[in-house]
Swiss-Prot record:
InterPro entries registered for this protein in UniProt: Rbsml_bL25/Gln-tRNA_synth_N (IPR020056), Ribosomal_bL25/Gln-tRNA_synth (IPR011035), Ribosomal_bL25_b-dom (IPR020057), Ribosomal_bL25_C (IPR037121), Ribosomal_bL25_long (IPR001021), Ribosomal_L25_dom (IPR029751), Ribosomal_uL5_bac-type (IPR020930)
Subunit structure: Part of the 50S ribosomal subunit; part of the 5S rRNA/L5/L18/L25 subcomplex. Contacts the 5S rRNA. Binds to the 5S rRNA independently of L5 and L18.
Keyword Calcium on entry: no
HAMAP family with a match to the protein in the record: Ribosomal_bL25_CTC
Its biological purpose: This is one of the proteins that binds to the 5S RNA in the ribosome where it forms part of the central protuberance.
GO BP annotation list: translation
Protein's UniProt name: Large ribosomal subunit protein bL25
Keywords tagged on the record: Ribonucleoprotein, Ribosomal protein, RNA-binding, rRNA-binding
Organism field: Wolbachia pipientis subsp. Culex pipiens (strain wPip)
Gene3D superfamilies documented for this protein: Ribosomal protein L25, beta domain (2.170.120.20), Ribosomal Protein L25, Chain P (2.40.240.10)
GO cellular component terms listed in the entry, alphabetical order: cytosolic large ribosomal subunit
SUPFAM superfamilies: Ribosomal protein L25-like
Similarity annotation: Belongs to the bacterial ribosomal protein bL25 family. CTC subfamily.
Length: 203
């Protein structure tokens, strides 16, 4: 599981806070933003709407450590919230969280299901039921994985993969879940197979 590459976003300090002033920024192609975090003062920013939207659509901002270049001063951050215009589907505001290198953070990491072609259950027509598409982990910023791979090799119809079956990279830990060993994915028989089995049983 490869560690993710750093994403860089350019930002500038923002003095204006009033609603009309921020709307004027948007009309000029900028996005109002803020960065905050424990032990840090809130800092108001502006971003290039074109640059940020391009990074977002490429998937580069999902669970990624970001290097914010704030008028030449570099800070590490995570995207914590994005507000969208309900009609235009454009970004209206972005919340970042400061990240201190060396400290551990909680972050949701997407799951990637690999080796479907090596699953006998899927080859026999089984259906892959994904119950969980991301999991929360705790690690230092430099250890954040791009994805966590779930290997389907050898899995038969009726088998499941649970959280305790997943191997994490060194330095990455699962965050406790209310259900200790929850199910991530199962391989079930197709409906037609189930109906056929039921018919044979009734006969």
């Amino acid at each position: 599981m490869a560690q993710q590459e750093m994403v860089t976003i350019n930002a500038e300090l923002r003095d204006v806070k009033k609603k009309k002033a921020m709307q004027a920024l948007r009309e000029k192609g900028s996005i109002p933003a803020v960065i905050y975090g424990k032990g840090h003062d809130n800092v108001n920013l502006t971003l290039s709407a074109k640059e940020f939207t391009k990074q977002y659509k490429s998937g580069a901002l999902s669970a990624h450590l970001i290097e914010l270049d704030i008028s030449g001063k570099k800070e590490y951050a995570l995207v914590r919230d994005i507000q969208w215009h309900v009609v235009k589907d454009t970004v209206q505001h972005v919340d970042f969280q400061f990240v201190d290198k060396g400290s551990e953070i909680k972050i949701d990491i997407p799951l990637s299901f690999i080796n479907e072609s090596k699953s006998p259950g899927i080859k026999l027509g089984g259906v892959l039921n994904v119950l969980c598409r991301s999991i929360t982990v705790k690690c230092s910023p430099e250890k954040i994985p791009q994805v966590i791979e779930i290997d389907l090799s050898g899995k038969m119809i009726g088998q499941s993969i649970h959280i305790n079956d997943v191997k994490l990279p060194e330095g990455v830990k699962f965050v406790a879940h209310e259900e200790e060993n929850f199910t991530i994915v199962t391989i079930s028989a197709a409906d037609s197979d189930v109906e056929e089995t039921q018919t044979k049983t009734e006969e």
